[in-house]
Every structure is written in C-alpha cells, then in structure tokens.
Amino acid sequence: MNEVMVIKEGWLQKRGEYIKTWRPRYFLLKSDGSFIGYKEKPESTEHNVVLPPLNNFSVAECQLMKTERPRPNTFVIRCLQWTTVIERTFHVDTPEEREEWIIAIQTVANGLKNQVPEDEEEEAMEVKYGSPSDVSSAEQMDVAMSKGHPKVTMNDFDYLKLLGKGTFGKVILVREKATGRYYAMKILRKEVIIAKDEVAHTLTESRVLQNTKHPFLTALKYAFQTSDRLCFVMEYANGGELFFHLSRERVFTEDRARFYGAEIVSALEYLHSRNVVYRDIKLENLMLDKDGHVKITDFGLCKEGITDGATMRTFCGTPEYLAPEVLEDNDYGRAVDWWGLGVVMYEMMCGRLPFYNQDHERLFELILMEEIRFPRTLSPEAKSLLAGLLKKDPKQRLGGGPNDAQEVMSHRFFVSINWQDVTERKLTPPFKPQVTSEIDTRYFDDEFTAQSITLTPPDRYDNLDALESDQRPHFPQFSYSASIRE
C-alpha cells in the first residue's frame, strides 16, 4: 500500500458555493486525490494529527478550467458526482501560482488514473442496483462493464415523454424495445462536463456504479455514451413526486408523514453504512412507486438553471433545503441528510417550509439564525423530532452523533414503527397512486409531459459501433449494464 503524501499545500481563496463570497482556506493536495482545506494552516501534518478539515473532496478524474472572472487567476475543478455535475472555484494571486496548482492537481489525477489495474478493467461484475455515490469512495465500489453484454445504444429505446430538463441535460421516459420495460433516461451533454482542448476526462465504472440494492433507492440499469452525450438509464417510479401529492393536499397527517419518513430513514441508513452521503434530500427527489412506496431518485439536473453571469457557473441546489453547515461552506458529513429529512418532514406535517424568503440572502440568514416555529396542531412527538432534525449545529442534531440513523429510528415519534417491516416493504402505504399502467404519467408535471421529445440534433443518435474507442478519448470506459435483467 502506497503511503499517502502531501503533494502541494498553500493558501487558496475558495468561493462559497451558495453565499458567493471568497474565503481563505489552507489546502493540502494529497497523493490519494484528497484535496482538503482548513481555516488555519494546520500546526502539524505529521501522523495526520490535525483538526478535521472544513473542505474535503477528491480531484480524481476531475476537469480543470482556467478563467479570469470573477477574479484574475481563477481556476475551477469540475467533476461528476454520481450523475450530477459539481464545481469548486478557487483563485490565487499570480498566473504562475495558478499554473503550479493546476499541474499538481493534474499530475495527481493522472497518477490515480494509471493505478487502475488492467485486469480490473476486463472483469465483468454483476451490478443489481446503483445509488448516489460519493466521489471519494471510488475504491469501495464494485463495477460492471458492458464486456460480455450486448452494447446498449440510444436506438434500443422508444422516447415517450419529457419528465424534466435543466442546464446540463434532460430526463425522458423511455421504453426498452427488447423488453417493453419503462425507464427514466437521464441524458447529459458531454460538452458541459468536458470542454474542447481540455485534459481528457475519464469516467470509470468504479466512479459511477455502486453495487447497492435497497427498496427505496432508484436503481441504475444502464449507462452508455454517444459522441456528444452521456446516458444513464434508471428505474422509473411513476407514482409521482411527493411534492406533487403534497401540493394537492396541502398537508399530510402525521401517520402518513411517519410512513414516508421511515422509508427515507431506512434508505439513508443504508447509504450512510456504505459511507455515502446523499446530500440532496428534498421533496422533488422523493418519488412514489406504483404501490405508494418511496423511491429516492437521482434525476438532479440543476432545474433552476440560474447562472452567475460573471463565471457562467450554474447555481445547483434548491436553497430552501440547504443545511447551515453547507451555507457556511464548511465540510459536511452525514448530518446534512438528517437536516434534509427534517425539512421534508416539516413540509409534510406543517404544509410549508421551515424557512422561506424569496430573497436568497434573507433566506440564508433565516436558515443560519432563525429559531424553528411549529403550528399548534402538531403533536409533542412531532415537534420534538423536527426540533432535533433541524438543529443548526450538525454535532447537536438528531442523527448527528456516532450512532447516526439509530438516533433517529429510536426517537419516540417512530415508536410504532417496526424497522425490519419497513425495509421489507411490509407496511401498507397510506396512499396508492391511481396509475393504470407503467406508462401512466398523470402524476408528472404537465409542463414537461406535454412537450415533444427533441434531442438536438435529432440525427445524432450515433451508431457507437462506428466510433472506435480511440476516437472518443474523453470517456474510454463509459459503457456498462446491470448484468441481470429482472
């Protein structure tokens, strides 16, 4: 096992992802790809006896971009986290300093790429389910390759309805021609992930597919590429977004909220046990399947499409759901998911968001400072649960301790819940969607389902067989499929 070494260290200005101020951070770039930032220069890096970092992410398989806006000598690190594009923005004082950082980061990223053993690339492994993945846990993931399986292309599907669209791509309801099964296909434009003339950006299966299986997580069936797109084919839950149902009914009973909350907790416990933080719990990411059980989706597309004019950097994330530690640009762990659970359960039981203001600056202030308030109609157990989940300090938050999900599961609000029955889908859903078939999209937004499907340009459903792998160097390994058809 190679010893992890510090390759480069020094002060960088890091731009906040939500509150867009620049904050000085002392960063260490390590040989394992970790890129960690501190408020102060760590006193000692010997024996790794240092305070926990404020920022901690991986530069493995990242794309690097230089820009002179909004400040001179800025650089952006962009990578794909599961199927969502994320960016981090930094600036330094001189072009020479920026060049040093870029070369160091690129050298580390290239070194990691070369460490993938060839026999691992050849091996076909069974993957039943995929789930949102933390970029830093690539080594822990099982992979599935298309070798030994028929190649999947865009021609294998009928394109039925547009389910969502955003800055980086769109999600379409498709039918697999061979099986008649319905899926949601998330299509990302490569150009937003790789710029022309930039360093090759490789997507390996270990990054994208994780061998996870859970009843309340959306499964990934296939991933493949065309010359200009990346395509993720995911399980399709057609009972509608919880957001859709809640907006119709305004508020759910505590029993109904308890049912959905328990299924979300079960899924989060599963992800956390695999060192994956979901980070994006919000009503729009919670679907119901045809039986009325929860499915946590990964259709994230930066729906807002709000772009910062200076950097053309897209604002991703629904600000109402952001946890205080995310706003403060501190590194965040599993507790961020318990905050997200608190927000969605508050919405379900109270019929409104815990913190809201149209002005984002004011909203962020409320999230960071405002005390939570409850309607009089709420039971003491519900108030206690929500107050615990919505604690500002992640260390004090319910679920924020070492016992993680167990703290939430043992809260008295869930006293009537048999957690084994939850995971085995034995609880009767409080609402069964009125869908007549798998293709019934009555619970999806008319704004999308009424639109016709256009993939521009329409004639570029590439025949990938005509493209030799060396002609598409950016994504040489990007095609695989779950090896079992259910």
From Swiss-Prot:
Domain Protein kinase: 157-414
Residue numbers spanned by region Disordered: 455-486
E.C. no: 2.7.11.1
Molecular function GO labels: ATP binding; protein serine kinase activity; protein serine/threonine kinase activity
CDD domains the UniProt entry points to: PH_PKB, STKc_PKB_beta
EC class of the enzyme, as a word: transferase
Record keywords: ATP-binding, Glycoprotein, Kinase, Nucleotide-binding, Phosphoprotein, Serine/threonine-protein kinase, Transferase
Phosphothreonine modification, residue list: T314
AGC-kinase C-terminal domain location: 415-486
Composition skew (Basic and acidic residues), residue ranges: 459-473
Residues recorded with modification Phosphoserine: S479
Catalytic activity annotation: L-seryl-[protein] + ATP = O-phospho-L-seryl-[protein] + ADP + H(+); L-threonyl-[protein] + ATP = O-phospho-L-threonyl-[protein] + ADP + H(+)
Post-translational modification: Phosphorylation on Thr-314 and Ser-479 is required for full activity. Phosphorylation of the activation loop at Thr-314 by PDPK1/PDK1 is a prerequisite for full activation. Phosphorylation by mTORC2 at Ser-479 in response to growth factors plays a key role in AKT1 activation by facilitating subsequent phosphorylation of the activation loop by PDPK1/PDK1.
Positions glycosylated per UniProt: S133, S136, T311, T318, S479
Any Gene Ontology biological process: positive regulation of protein targeting to membrane
Ranges where the PH domain occurs: 5-110
Residue spans crossing the bilayer: none
InterPro entries: AGC-kinase_C, Akt2, Kinase-like_dom_sf, PH-like_dom_sf, PH_domain, PH_PKB, Pkinase_C, Prot_kinase_dom
Residues binding ATP: L163, G164, K165, G166, T167, F168, G169, K170, V171, K186
One Gene Ontology CC term in the entry: cell cortex
Pfam families referenced in this protein's UniProt entry, alphabetically: PH, Pkinase, Pkinase_C
Role: Akt2-a is one of several closely related serine/threonine-protein kinases known as the AKT kinase, and which regulate many processes including metabolism, proliferation, cell survival, growth and angiogenesis. This is mediated through serine and/or threonine phosphorylation of a range of downstream substrates. Over 100 substrate candidates have been reported so far, but for most of them, no isoform specificity has been reported. May be involved in the inhibition of ciliogenesis.
Official protein name in the record: RAC-beta serine/threonine-protein kinase A
Biological source species: Xenopus laevis
